[in-house]
Amino acid sequence: MDIKAYFELIRLKNCLTASFGAFIGGLIASYFNISMIDNLILASIVVFLVCGFGNALNDIYDLKIDKINKPKRPIPSKRISLGEARIFSYLLVVMGLIISMFNITCFLMAVLNSIVLQQYASTYKKNKIVGNLIVAYLTGSVFIFGGIAVGNIDVTIMLFLCALFAMWSREIIKDYEDIEGDIKEKVISIPIKCGEKSIYIAAFLLVFAVLLSPLPYLFGFFGIYYLISVIFCDLLFLIGIYNLVMNPSKKEAKKASRNIKIVTNLVLIAFLIGSLFK
């Protein structure tokens, strides 16, 4: 068995990042209550396994395209057979769902996200108008999952919403970068439908995320340290998207996409600061 090939199949780095997101979400929601560590570890394992299932499914459904565009991926390179990939993906999701039974709400959300991942891989990868929203939802949902695991989703819902709208904006900007390739692949996307106007849609979504970001302070969940930290992040968001609106080039779109990814991680740190120094 080529272990490295299986790690490539599930995109190990992505799985670890998602798993870490659930762990951090739970830490924030529990205000660093160490007695919840068992639940946090279980939640992180579930997210790792379900994320791996989704990534493996993507490669299964993309086999024809990957034979041309990514021939070194595990399945087209025949390091893993199509049948082995299917069995492995089923094992991942079954193990993830079994472990998620430590909390009935976690189990229900794991089932929901597994279905969403399957639908995304099979149906919505070429319809990015829907697919972008799915990716944004899945990105943000790991924080709620961590909150569910520790029995408190109040703060993580706000983190989820900020992440959802920021990532939704980023996905549209990425599609703007890739518009020529998507036209060739007959993909449906907002930039293909709207052209440069799609930048304004992305800007609106990002500004909405910025407007949501002070809510944990306004509702009294976090204190002034959070507010100062998140305002700094918001300024970085706004500068990046302003530059793109003023100069809607592919080069500027790439910068804006990278900026959103980096600043979203900084927002996560702001939430950690808020949880630590309430």
Swiss-Prot record:
Superkingdom classification of source: Archaea
Residues passing through the membrane, by range: 12-32, 34-54, 91-111, 142-162, 204-224, 226-246, 257-277
Compartments it resides in: Cell membrane
Disulfide pairings: none
Cofactor entry: Mg(2+)
Pfam family, one: UbiA
A GO MF label: magnesium ion binding
Membrane topology, record value: Multi-pass membrane protein
Catalytic activity: sn-3-O-(geranylgeranyl)glycerol 1-phosphate + (2E,6E,10E)-geranylgeranyl diphosphate = 2,3-bis-O-(geranylgeranyl)-sn-glycerol 1-phosphate + diphosphate
Family annotation (InterPro entries): DGGGP_synth, Prenyltransferase_related, UbiA_prenyltransferase, UbiA_sf
EC numbers: 2.5.1.42
Main location as per UniProt: membrane
Pathway field: Membrane lipid metabolism; glycerophospholipid metabolism
GO BP terms, alphabetized: glycerophospholipid biosynthetic process
Keywords: Cell membrane, Lipid biosynthesis, Lipid metabolism, Magnesium, Membrane, Phospholipid biosynthesis, Phospholipid metabolism, Transferase, Transmembrane, Transmembrane helix
Any Gene Ontology CC annotation: plasma membrane
HAMAP family linked to this entry: DGGGP_synth
Role according to the record: Prenyltransferase that catalyzes the transfer of the geranylgeranyl moiety of geranylgeranyl diphosphate (GGPP) to the C2 hydroxyl of (S)-3-O-geranylgeranylglyceryl phosphate (GGGP). This reaction is the second ether-bond-formation step in the biosynthesis of archaeal membrane lipids.
Family in the record: Belongs to the UbiA prenyltransferase family. DGGGP synthase subfamily.
Name listed for the protein in its UniProt record: Digeranylgeranylglyceryl phosphate synthase
Organism lineage: Archaea, Methanobacteriati, Methanobacteriota, Methanomada group, Methanococci
